[in-house]
Amino acid sequence: MTRTDGDTWDLATSVGSTATGVAAMRALATRQPDPLIDDPYADALVKAVGLEHCIALADGETCVEGDPMLDLNRMCEQIAVRTRYFDELFIAAGADGVRQAVILASGLDTRAYRLDWPAGTVVFEVDQPQVIEFKTRTLADLGAQPTAERRTVAVDLRDDWPAALRDAGFDPAEPTAWIAEGLLIYLPAEAQDRLLDNITALSAPGSRLATEHMDHRILAEGAGKRIGEWSRRVGSSLDIADLFYTGERNTAGDYLRGLGWQVTVRPSKEAYADHGFELPEEMAELSGDSGYLSAHLK
């Protein structure tokens, strides 16, 4: 499925289905011995969406052999490391007194329910209306209760989401912790720049931001093809690589530095090692100069 201007989705189609796949890996990671992350709602959310290949992933029943890039355990480690990185951004910001958090393209993210937020924290979740409605209803049916004040902002990030965020009670005069997890790869180059411009315009001094540091050259080369192969082999009807926007673009880190942010990049290999994992050499070669990015606005 090739992307088009104005395309929409729910959690079983297009970009939305990738959020379900990531939640499936979080469910599997949560059941590992001595788990790096704990997402007690991921499994139920995946099953509620009902995509068979994602349910099989969550249950650990998918077997893809013969390629370290396609190994289920490796994919589980990757999502666990990624999830933990963004968890820690929010935890550190809260410890420093930040009481406003924004999750962009929140999908099946349950941090508003599973993290131990400081008293007085408001968490804003921004995503497509049908995605927000499904998750809110399903978690309510499960009896889940947010651990912070949760406010939903049902808007497409290609529309005027800053206005919708302010209408939901967001205060740009207060420092904010932002995450854009697994998002930039699905945006055209100019939309990525516009997103970072908007985040900056809404950020008071003391704000934090975390996202991926992507080597976008790899998507047009080997990695994009391999990711597409993996999605087909686990039973998806989508070629995930068709959802990516490839081509030349500003790196998020350089662009944010130009906007006045102090940027730190944690290479993937080091992020793995932080938690006792080893990034396979072939994955390291395919991922290129990729990792995780955190930024602080002084």
UniProtKB/Swiss-Prot annotation:
<comment type="similarity">
    <text>Belongs to the UPF0677 family.</text>
</comment>
<dbReference type="InterPro" id="IPR007213">
    <property type="entry name" value="Ppm1/Ppm2/Tcmp"/>
</dbReference>
<dbReference type="GO" id="GO:0032259">
    <property type="term" value="P:methylation"/>
</dbReference>
<protein>
    <recommendedName>
        <fullName>Putative S-adenosyl-L-methionine-dependent methyltransferase MSMEG_1480/MSMEI_1444</fullName>
        <ecNumber>2.1.1.-</ecNumber>
    </recommendedName>
</protein>
<dbReference type="GO" id="GO:0008168">
    <property type="term" value="F:methyltransferase activity"/>
</dbReference>
<keyword id="KW-0808">Transferase</keyword>
<dbReference type="Pfam" id="PF04072">
    <property type="entry name" value="LCM"/>
</dbReference>
<comment type="function">
    <text>Exhibits S-adenosyl-L-methionine-dependent methyltransferase activity.</text>
</comment>
<keyword id="KW-0949">S-adenosyl-L-methionine</keyword>
<dbReference type="InterPro" id="IPR029063">
    <property type="entry name" value="SAM-dependent_MTases_sf"/>
</dbReference>
<dbReference type="InterPro" id="IPR011610">
    <property type="entry name" value="SAM_mthyl_Trfase_ML2640-like"/>
</dbReference>
<feature type="binding site">
    <location>
        <position position="127"/>
    </location>
    <ligand>
        <name>S-adenosyl-L-methionine</name>
    </ligand>
</feature>
<feature type="binding site">
    <location>
        <begin position="156"/>
        <end position="157"/>
    </location>
    <ligand>
        <name>S-adenosyl-L-methionine</name>
    </ligand>
</feature>
<keyword id="KW-0489">Methyltransferase</keyword>
